[in-house]
Amino acid sequence: TELTGRDAKTIHRLLEVDFGEENGRVKFRRNSRNPLPYDAVIVDEMSMVDIEIFASLMQALRLGSKLIMVGDPDQLPSVGPGNVLRDLIDSDVIPVIHLTEVFRQAAESLIVTSAHAIVAGEMPDLTVRDNDFFFLQKSSSEAVLQTVVDLCARRLPASYGYSPVRDIQVISPTRLGACGTAELCRKLQEVLNPQDERKTEQKFGPGVFREGDKVMQIRNNYDIVYTRDDGEQ
């Protein structure tokens, strides 16, 4: 949007989602009877689009409109049903352009070479250490948790000058357990933003939101913030 000067929005917002449901499905104001007024629509991160949302988008395109889809079929498929991008590419029905050069990291970056190995079904070389990729092996979940906390609170800030809140993001594949997001957030909050009578707190379920916490919005509210916006509360 910075280069084109045009707005970008989610498919739900583009199709003018109606927050009521019909037969258990989300309703959109844009459809075959009320199509989008555009000659071309570009969809980024197409691997995240499930078959139901894609069907709604196709119905809302007017005759003669062009649909340009951008995405990586090797990323995780959508949470909802279908593997739309992969199926479209494999169909040999639509024109496909494969981009092979990585610009986000250097070609020799261990992040890049390790990712390519995993996509090819091979084990990445975990013995090599580089500035952008490190593998730390631990024997228990508790040891992993303590290592993550130590990396965020001490080692990465000391080695690279990172701010634990602004420059570091921890990702976990689970919510529960010693290495799940719930316990990671609790432990990191305890170390990085401890309880202080001068800070406002708000209890929410089993956890506590504290002034100065890093938070992430995970459900869209178009009047306030967008999904994946994060900041300090």
PLM features per residue range, with description:
Residues 1-129:
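ASCE P-loop NTPase helicase motor core
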Residues 73-232:
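Conserved helicase motor core of P-loop NTPases
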